[in-house]
Amino acid sequence: MKQVSKITICLLCVAMVLTGCRDKERSKADTANHQAAVSQSMKRISKVEKQGDMRQYDVADKQRITDFIPKGYKLFEKISGDLNKDGLEDCVLIIKATRKDGFVKNSFDKVVDRNRRGIIILFTEKDGYKLASKNYNCFSSENEEGGVYYAPELWVEERKGNLYLRYCHGRYGYWEYCFRYQGSDFMLIGYEATYNRGPLVLGKTSINFLTGVEYDDENINADKFDADSDDDPVADEVFKRTVVKLKKKPLIKLSEIEDFDELRFE
């Protein structure tokens, strides 16, 4: 009996040792799996946080621009270009008023947005933007009446460091203003216009406000066109030039122009 008891005790000890080893191995495996799960979870969290940070930067960048837009206006168009020749892309914002009384019926009995437009110019700097010039109401609405034709279309662009504001009126020609940053504002330094009948140029005007000289070119063959089409010229365009010396005046500031539609030069 004593011998049997000893054998039983030995077997119980062996079983306990084996069970302990299995539990230890299982514990190691569980720990490894838990650590792997935690690591994977941290990677997912890190990725989400990174994406969130990027979205935050995008929003912050947009906020730096829109912070310059006054209450009661919305962004109509954004144009980029180096306007102070420092190698950085500056920002031109065309804004539009959002007044409720600006919505009216046109001649076709259709409700259109006649709110006026303006311009904000921002210079790009290392830590954001700096206001260079602003004029909140100098442009008419894009939905003005165009008579038998559509309303003139405003084009804004940067060329060789200068700001160009061009009104295109299809077959009737265009007129364009050239501004250059000087001192603390954008100054009007040039003006061009063409007067067309379809492809036929009737006349051209070019003014250099720096030199105070105006050039008026008149097509002396303007009356020679195809009578059936009232458009196609039958003779080459030949221009007669008249040079006009303008009175010396201070350059016009972009920020001080009340209405481009009423701007006249003498």
Residue ranges and their predicted role:
Residues 1-9:
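Bacterial N-terminal signal peptides that target proteins for export
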Residues 18-20:
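C-terminal motif of bacterial Sec signal peptides marking the signal peptidase cleavage site
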Residues 22-35, 42-45, 153-266:
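Acidic, small-residue rich beta-repeat scaffolds with periodic aromatic anchors
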Residues 34, 38-71, 127-148:
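Blade-edge motifs of beta-propeller repeat domains
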Residues 73-78:
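Primarily EF-hand calcium-binding motifs
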Residues 83-95, 157-167:
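Acidic/hydrophobic-patterned starts of short beta strands in beta-sheet-rich repeat architectures
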Residues 89-107:
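Charged, amphipathic alpha-helical segments
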Residues 102-136, 179-181:
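Beta-propeller blade repeat segments, especially FG-GAP/WD-type strand-to-loop junctions
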